[in-house]
Each structure stands twice: as C-alpha cells, then as structure tokens.
From Swiss-Prot:
Keywords of this entry: Cytoplasm, Cytoskeleton, Microtubule
Protein name: Gamma-tubulin complex component 5
Subunit structure: Component of the gamma-tubulin ring complex (gTuRC) consisting of TUBGCP2, TUBGCP3, TUBGCP4, TUBGCP5 and TUBGCP6 and gamma-tubulin TUBG1 or TUBG2. TUBGCP2, TUBGCP3, TUBGCP4, TUBGCP5 and TUBGCP6 assemble in a 5:5:2:1:1 stoichiometry; each is associated with a gamma-tubulin, thereby arranging 14 gamma-tubulins in a helical manner. Gamma-tubulin at the first position is blocked by TUBGCP3 at the last position, allowing 13 protafilaments to grow into a microtubule.
Gene encoding the protein: Tubgcp5
Described function: Component of the gamma-tubulin ring complex (gTuRC) which mediates microtubule nucleation. The gTuRC regulates the minus-end nucleation of alpha-beta tubulin heterodimers that grow into microtubule protafilaments, a critical step in centrosome duplication and spindle formation.
Entry's Gene Ontology molecular function annotations: gamma-tubulin binding; microtubule binding
Organism this protein belongs to: Mus musculus (Mouse)
Top-rank taxon, per record: Eukaryota
Gene Ontology CC terms, in alphabetical order: centrosome; ciliary basal body; cytosol; gamma-tubulin ring complex; microtubule; spindle pole
Example GO biological process: microtubule nucleation
Subcellular location: Cytoplasm, Cytoskeleton, Microtubule organizing center, Centrosome
Keyword check for Cytoplasm: yes
Segments of skewed composition (Low complexity): 529-543
Family membership noted in the UniProt record: Belongs to the TUBGCP family.
Length: 1024
C-alpha cells in the first residue's frame, strides 16, 4: 500500500519517524529512496493500520501473576514473592500518564508484555532497587479567597437548605430503572392503593422496552414454595385441566371424596427442580432430603397430569437423585468435606475415618468428580433451553434426553455399592483397593460381552477404571523403574518386609509379601512372593477365588521380578551409572501410566482409521475369513467335532490377532465395533496390547541388567564353576591331590580325621591352581553313626566341604544348595576311595606273598593238623588266579560307575547347565535353573529315597571292593577260600540285581540316562 501522507500533527510526524527508524534497524536499509526500503515501509504501515489484535485478557494476566507468586513461595523465595506481589499491585492501582484510571487495558498490556519477555529470563540474582516516590506538593494557596477578593456574597436566611430546582426533580424522575437485577419484584397492588395526592409526583419511566414492567412481572418466579397461593394462568383446554377433571370424576364417583390441600406448580418448575436434584442441590421444595433419603412431596400437582401419574414419574427421578447424593457424599468424604457440617435432618452423619482415604479411592473419587462435571454441564444446557423457551420442553422430553445418563447412574450405583459401600469398614486398604478394581474390571467384562448395545456403558466404566487404576500403575512404575515400593497406605497387593535388609541372603525370598484374600471366607493369607512367582499362573484350590487384582495376574511375576531386581541393582550401586545421568534419563522417561494411555489412544485411533479400509477391502476380509475357517475346521475334525458355526467363530477369533494373521494370511487386519468388522476388540486384548508390553519391556531391562551385573561385576559364573570344580571334582588334579592324601592315611591305618590336617591338605591342593578360592574353601569332620563306620565304605561319612559365597551370589548358591553339593561330593569320594583302593593294588605284592606262603609249606608239619590260615584244598596258584579275576571284575564295576557319574551325569548335565545359565533372563529363573541342575544330578546319582535300594546295592559292591583291597594288602595268609567264594557270590548277586533293575528301567524309558551304565555293567557279566 502507499505510504500515508504526513499531517501537521506532531504525533503523526513522530510516528512516521519511528516507523522509518524501525525499518532501518530491522532490515539494515538506510536509503529511503531504495525500493526495498519503500516496500518494507509499506508493509509496516499496512500492519499498523489494517491488522487487528485481540485485547489483553486481564483475568489471564492476573492468573499468571498469582502463579508466579505461588512459584516464588514454593521455592522459598519469600522476599521475591512479597516484592512481586507488592509491585504489581502498586502498578495496577497507579495512574498512567495517559489516563487517570486504574487497572486499565494499558496497565494489563504492559504487564502482559513484561510477562512475555520473562519467558527467556537471564540467570541473575534479583535485588530490588528502592525508589523514592515523588510526593505531590499540596497546594495550600486559597484560590477561592484570592478570586473572590473584593466581592460581597449575600447569604439568605435558609443557608443550610439547598434550593433544588424543578429541573432536578425532573432529572431524577427520568433516571432509568434497570432490570438487570432480577431480584427486584414489583408489586402492582401497593401502587394502585397509593394516595391520589401523590399521583402528580415523579413517575418511574421504563427504558429499552415499551412494556418493561410486564417483562419483569413475567420473569420473576412466583414463590410457590411458600404457603401463599398463586393462581397460575393456563389454557382452558381439557388436556390442560386433567388434574381438575380427574378430581371432579373422583368426587362424582365417591360423594365422600375430599380433595387434599395441594400446591399447584408448573411443569417448568418441576423440570427445574428435577435438574437441580440431579445436579446435587439438597434444599428444594418438590423433592425433600429426609434422613439421607430423597422423597417427593405428596401435595404437589400440575394442572395437566393426575397426581398419581406425576408422583410415579417423580419417584423414579428421586431414585436417581438418591444415587447422585450417594455418590456426591462419597466424593465430599474423600475430598475432606465432612457431612457433619450439614444441618440436622439432611442426611445421616457417617463416622469420619481417622485415616485419610487411600490413593485408589481418591482416584476413583476424581473419576466420579469429572463425570459429574460433564453431567452438570449437560444439565445446564437443558436448563438454558428451558429458560430460553425457544422450543417446547416437557418433563417427558427431559427424561428422554437424560435416559442415557440415568442408565449410567444406575451402573455407577451398582459399581459403587459392590466395590465401595458393601465393603466392611474394618477391611484392610489392600482388600478395598483390590476389590474396587476387580469390581470395575468384572463390570467392564460383563458389559463388554453384550456388544454394541452397551458400548456407552463400557466406555464409561473403562474411563473410570483407567482413572482409578492410576495409583496402582504409579506404584508399579515406581517399583520396577526406581526399585522403591512406595505404598504408605498399604493398598498395593505386594508389601515390603522391612525386617529383611537388601544385603541379606534371604532378600530374594522373604522381602516381599503377596496378599491374597478369599472372597468366600474373607480371611487374609500371606503367600510368599517367591512361591507365587515360581508357580507363575498356577491357581490355588478351585474352592477359593482370590481377590487379587485380576488385571495384573498375567504380568504379576514380571512385576515382582523387575521390582526386586531393580531394588537389588540400586543397592549394588551399579544400576544406571552416575546419579546425574540417571536423573536426566528419568526426566525424559514417560511413566507407565502415560505409556498406557498413549497406547490406548493409538489403538483407538488405529481402529477408527482402519474402519474405511476394512469396508473398502471387504472382499479381502471375506477371503481371509474363509481361509481361517478352513484351518479351524481341519483342527476341529481332529477332535471329531463338526460344527460350522464354531469353526467360523474360531476363524474370527484368529483373525483378530495380527501375529496369527501374518503367519497364515500374510497381512494385517484391524477391526472395529461396526457390523462390518470381523469381531470386536475385547478388554483383555486391550490390556494385552497396551499395558503388558510396557511391563515386559521394563522387566527384560531390569532383569537383564541384574544378570549382566552379577556375571560381570560379581563373578557369578566363576563361583558356579568353583562349586563344580571342588564339590563335583571337575578340577581333577586339585581334588586328586587332596583326597589321595586322605586315602593314603586310611590305607596306612593312620589318624586322618584331624580338622587341621584336612584343611592344610585342602589349602595346599587348592592354593596351587586356584589361589583366589583357597581362602573360601574349608572342610570339617563330624562323627556319624558308629554302626555305619564298621563298614569301610562309610568311613568317609562326616566329611563336609564348605565354600564361603559372598553376597549377592549367595542368593543363588545358598546353604541348602551346598547341602546337596555335599551329598554328591560324599558319593564321589566313596567311589573314588573304592577306585583308588583297587588301583593301587599290585600283582607283585600278591605274588611275593604266595612265594612266602609256599616256602612255609616246605617246612615239615603234622599233616593231620588242620590249618586255620592259608589256602585250603586248591593250589595256591589257582587261588591267586581267582583273586586276580575278582579284582578285575570289581575294577570294571567301579570304573563303569565312576565313568558314568563323572561323564554321563556331571559333565553332560554341567554343559546343559552352563547353556541354561547363559540364557537365563532373570535371577529367579537362574535360581530355578540351579535348583533343577542340583536336583537332576541328585536324582541321577541315585541319591533319592525312591531308588535307595539301587544305591544300597552299589554301596555293597563298593564295600566289597574295599574289603577285597584290605585283604589283598594283608596277603594270602589272611584269606580263607570260603571268604573269597562268599565275596564272589555277593558280587555276582549284586551285579546281577543291578543289571536286571537297570535294564528294566531302560526298557520302560523312565531313566534313559542309565542306559550307558546298564550296557557297561552287562559287558562285565559272566556268560553262562
């Protein structure tokens, strides 16, 4: 546009100069003749002259000022807060150079500009600079005296009485009487009865309307709630006088009928009090609140309805009003507004709870509060329609409009009664919270199964549930993210046992308690979370239905594992690195509840966006449905079920799951609640897709970090390997040096049970190859039953190996685990003792003993004297040969057993165990893997009571081997032929028994790992 011509006004010239200077400063152009300068100048003038901007919002500025004041107060900047409050107040109450008024738009515009500039503050400490206010000099000069100097003023006799002119009276009479104040009531009757002498006085003149007085009379409500009767004008039509006609009929049919004294109200007044009742108003005329119950006044009638008809409708409305009062009372109680302040007779006075309501009740109250806000807005809109009278509004129309809301109130009352009101007052908070959430959850499932008919009800219940579950999800989020289970009101189903510290070895098992309450018996049980976590989704007896929060059952194990893992990580001081980095990451992180809401929104938007896509690709959907139906039919035919309807419903169910559809149909399908959709999204699927993945993700993150920390920083795998090296003797050379020193002492009949000797030998053996483990290993000896000690194989009973496992590795390698390790260790020691005793026997020793025995036979002796010792009838060489054969048989048996235990059991099972340890996702899974590994080797080493007879047979053979080695070492002179024959017979019987038992077990397939041992022992049997 063209540049405006400058006028002679000084302000216009100054404005033009300022605009040119603005263009120079912003664009950098200096020459006014430059075309670019002119374009910029025209643009600025265009914005100044033709653009319109909104006026400043004084309420918004006041709210911002108050918010800054509260912020200063919260941050303990009290000086700043006081200074800010005082300066802004002084500025708003001061006049500006351009105006004398206060709190003008100019004031608020300047403050708005300063507030906008404060969005990018500088980091500086504010110190208020005191300013001296300019005091206006009071003009003491008497201008009146100065100006009236020399003038004579005549004062009349009535100086104190002002002389009002008739013009002023006329002006007063012409003052308009505004009708903005709706409280003014003009009564015509007193005006008509006024004295006629005053008719000539000033009259009230009504402006704006020619008939303002009649307007005021029409818009002021008659006080129908008083005893004074008013005649309500209405039509003379028969339908408008139905009440009178009905009374006339009753009077004509019953001469003794006497009509009651009734108050006639209009239908509009009934509608208005109906809206007030549903809004929560307690003081009304038509509806009365007596002892907490809403009743209808009996003497109310309208002209066009019979008394019974009106009362029937109003009693139904009163029932819904009762629901509103009941829910509002709960809201007030939770918010802290006690009902004790109500006047007597307005309702029952419940006992005030000593403790504040817990967070789940507060969240439920907040959900109801938001619902009633929307409900009251709808009631306000209806009331505005009634006031405007643009359309016909009857009580039936209002009830019809409110029918969906009234149905929702009925559902809310049912949920509130079941979930809150019917719970005994002395019930624990954990039971109250769980019961309320379960009630909402079951109600959603119940109405969701109905389908489209209850879509609004499901939407209402789902919004209530989402709001009510917020504290639970916040508690879960705080626990699985920060490792802190904050639950001051003890409403969460998992409670922390503060008696067990984190660095205790029983932390993983005894720190948390899972509360489970039976609905039938209402008795509270405390179940260890380790048991519940290990059982997964296992349920208790069918006769007990627990009130555990239903929606958390599928992920309860993940929550417990993630929470304990994160707390353990926090205690290890290596969870998230430096605290500043963790705080920064936590500030950027979204809470579990926020992620849940976002997932729900995405799911709903996805369903809405995909509805046209489904309609457009209806043919593709039908083809996929037919394909799924054929698959379902084939699966049903395998079970001899021929049901086409069942098959097509299975097909629809499968199509709902995207992973199944991608696997079999190669695509994706989205469903909605319309009739064209394949099926409807159930509430469980919503939770499975919107809530559970976020919990699983945090579970994998926490437990993965804990496993990595234990393996990397606390050498968990190395400690497990050390247990196998020493207890299971995988460190062969080290343990060989240890136990051979003990075996040599036993063979030489020397004392070896000294604990100091045992520990010295152990330290010397371990310290050479595993110096870091030598300080952790120790051995002790305890005396056992003397009857067992008579047998050579039980001479080692009482040896106990101990390994000091540091925290937190002792959570995995517990004392109970070391007991199982020691049982296997003792068995291996007995087998190696028998094997060592047979291995150290030399053929030369027996040959030298035979030569010495033969030399003794050359000495003449009495042939008739029987020899107590020495070989009987058979020759000495034949006896030596039999002993050689028995030794080989015993060695074959012991070596077969030794190889089976060390290779097939310990080595193979150990490889599987190492692979499972690497794949363990959480500490609980690792503990189970370790226990399963110990249980496996315990069973396969035949240490279980069920197969004790097999172990006894093996122990008998080992005992024979040790007795044979002891006799071999003593020489032939200590043997009798009967002893050798008995030993051969016992060995043969035990051997045959074991082979038979093992073969039967292998043939049944119950113990496949025994197959190698059975084949090895069969190879050593004598062929008949």
């Amino acid at each position: 546009m063209a540049r405006p011509k400058s006028s002679g006004s000084r302000m216009d010239r100054q404005l033009e100069h300022d605009v040119c200077e603005l263009v120079r400063q912003v664009t950098g152009l200096q020459d006014e003749a430059d075309p670019n300068f002119q374009l910029a100048l025209d643009f600025v003038w265009s914005n100044f002259r033709f653009h319109r901007f909104l006026d400043v919002n004084s309420h918004k500025v006041e709210k911002t000022i108050e918010g800054i004041y509260e912020k200063f107060t919260i941050h303990s900047d009290l000086n700043k807060a006081a200074s800010w409050k005082r300066l802004t107040k002084e500025f708003l109450n001061a006049s500006l150079p351009s105006t004398e008024k206060i709190k003008t738009d100019a004031h608020y515009s300047i403050l708005s500009l300063l507030l906008c500039l404060s969005d990018s503050p500088s980091n500086s400490n504010y110190v208020e600079t005191p300013r001296e206010k300019e005091v206006e000099k009071k003009d003491d000069f008497d201008w009146g005296k100065y100006l009236m100097e020399g003038e004579e003023i005549g004062l009349g006799p009535n100086i104190d009485t002002p002389n009002w002119s008739e013009d002023s009276d006329d002006e007063d009479a012409q003052q308009p009487l505004s009708r903005e104040d709706s409280g003014i009531q003009v009564d015509r009757t007193p005006l008509e009865e006024q004295d006629h002498n005053r008719k000539g006085g000033p009259q009230v003149c009504w402006e704006d309307e020619p008939d303002s007085r009649s307007w005021l009379e029409q818009h002021v409500v008659h006080q129908y709630w008083t005893t004074r009767r008013f005649r309500i004008p209405h039509s003379a039509h028969l339908h408008s006088n139905l009440a009178a006609v009905w009374d006339q009929h009753l009077y004509s049919s019953d001469p003794l009928y006497v009509p009651d004294d009734r108050v006639v109200v209009t239908e509009t007044q009934v509608i208005r009090e109906t809206l007030w009742l549903l809004s929560g108003v307690k003081k009304m005329f038509i509806f009365q609140l007596i002892d907490g119950k809403v009743t209808v006044r009996n003497n109310i009638i309208v002209t066009h309805l019979t008394h019974s008809c009106l009362r029937s409708v109003l009693e139904q409305i009163a029932a819904y009003g009762q629901v509103v009062f009941r829910l509002q009372e709960f809201i007030d109680e939770v918010m802290g507004h006690s009902s004790e302040s109500l006047p007597p007779g307005n309702g029952p006075i419940p006992k005030k709870q000593p403790d504040a309501p817990f967070r789940t009740y507060q969240a439920f109250m907040w959900a109801l509060y938001k619902y009633f806000i929307n409900f009251k807005e709808e009631l306000t809109d209806i009331e505005k329609c009634v006031i405007s009278s643009d359309t016909t509004i009857t009580l039936a129309i209002v009830v019809n409009k409110l029918a969906p809301r009234l149905a929702q109130l009925k559902v809310l009352d049912k949920v509130f009664s079941t979930g809150v009101a019917e719970v005994p007052p002395d019930t624990r908070n954990v039971v109250r919270a769980s019961h309320l959430l379960n009630t909402l959850y079951k109600a959603i499932l119940e109405y969701d199964n109905v389908g489209e008919a209850s879509e609004q009800t499901v939407s209402l219940l789902f919004s209530l549930w989402v709001e009510t579950v917020r504290p639970y999800l916040q508690t879960v989020d705080e626990w699985i993210v920060h490792g802190h289970l904050w639950d001051g009101a003890r409403e969460f189903i998992i409670q922390r046992n503060k008696n067990v510290p984190v660095n205790h070895r029983d932390f993983w098992y005894a720190t948390y308690t899972l509360y489970s309450v039976s609905e039938k018996t209402e008795n509270e049980d405390k179940v260890s979370d380790s048991a519940s976590a290990s059982s997964g989704s296992d349920q208790g007896p069918s006769s007990r239905q627990h009130t555990m929060v239903s929606f958390l059952k599928p992920v309860l194990k993940q929550i417990i594992m993630a929470g304990k893992s994160m707390q353990l990580l926090k205690n290890l001081n290596c969870a998230e690195g430096p605290a500043c980095q963790a705080a920064a990451r936590d500030a950027e992180r979204k809470s579990l509840y926020t992620l849940f809401l976002e997932s729900i929104q995405l799911r709903l938007q996805h369903g809405e966006d995909s509805a046209p896509h489904i309609v457009n690709e209806d043919q593709t959907t039908k083809e996929n449905l037919i394909k799924m139906q054929s698959i379902a039919e084939r699966h049903l035919e395998l079970d001899d079920i021929h049901d086409p309807l069942l098959a097509i419903n299975f097909a629809r169910l499968y199509l709902e799951q995207s992973d199944f559809h991608e696997k079999f149909a190669g695509g994706d399908i989205c469903v909605d609640r319309s009739s064209e959709s394949v099926t409807c999204q159930t509430f469980e699927l919503t939770l499975r897709s919107c809530l559970y993945p976020h919990i699983d993700k945090q579970y994998l993150h926490c437990c993965g970090n804990l496993m990595q920390t234990l393996k990397r920083d606390f050498r968990l795998v190395e400690y497990l390997q050390a247990m196998r090296n020493f207890f299971l003797m995988e460190g062969g050379d080290t343990m060989y040096d240890f136990y051979t020193s003990i075996f040599d002492k036993i063979r030489e009949k020397e004392t070896w049970q000294n604990v100091s000797f045992l520990n010295v030998q152990l330290q010397e053996a371990v310290g050479q190859r595993y110096p870091e483990d030598s300080l952790r290993l120790s051995i002790s000896f305890e005396n056992v039953d003397t009857t067992k000690k008579k047998l050579p194989v039980h001479i080692l009973d009482g040896l106990t190996l101990s390994y000091k496992v540091p925290w937190p590795v002792d959570i995995v390698i517990s004392v109970e685990c070391q007991k199982i390790y020691n049982q296997v260790f003792l068995l291996l020691l007995q087998i190696k003792w028998a094997k060592y005793s047979l291995d150290v026997l030399l053929f030369g020793e027996l040959g030298n003993a035979a030569e010495r025995s033969q030399a003794k036979e050359d000495i003449p002796r009495d042939q008739d004297t029987p020899s107590q010792f020495g070989p009987p009838k058979e020759s000495l060489r034949q006896q030596i040969h039999r002993m050689f054969l028995l030794r080989v048989k015993l060695m074959h048996f012991v070596n077969s057993l030794h190889n089976y235990i060390m290779t097939r059991i310990l080595h193979s099972t150990g490889l599987e165990f190492q692979h499972q340890v690497e794949e363990a996702k959480d500490l609980d899974q690792l503990i189970k893997i370790h226990y399963r590994y110990l249980s496996t080797i315990h069973d396969r080493c035949l240490l279980r009571e069920k197969v004790s007879f097999v172990k006894e047979a093996i122990m008998k053979v080992l005992n024979l081997a040790l007795m044979f080695a002891e006799g071999w070492q003593a020489g032939l002179g200590a043997w009798q032929m009967e002893s050798i024959e008995k030993m051969e017979s016992d060995f043969k019987n035990c051997h045959m028994f074991l082979v038979t038992i093992l073969n039967k077990a292998v043939c049944r397939g119950s113990f496949p790992h025994l197959e190698s041992l059975a084949l090895s022992l069969m190879a050593g049997m004598e062929q008949s």
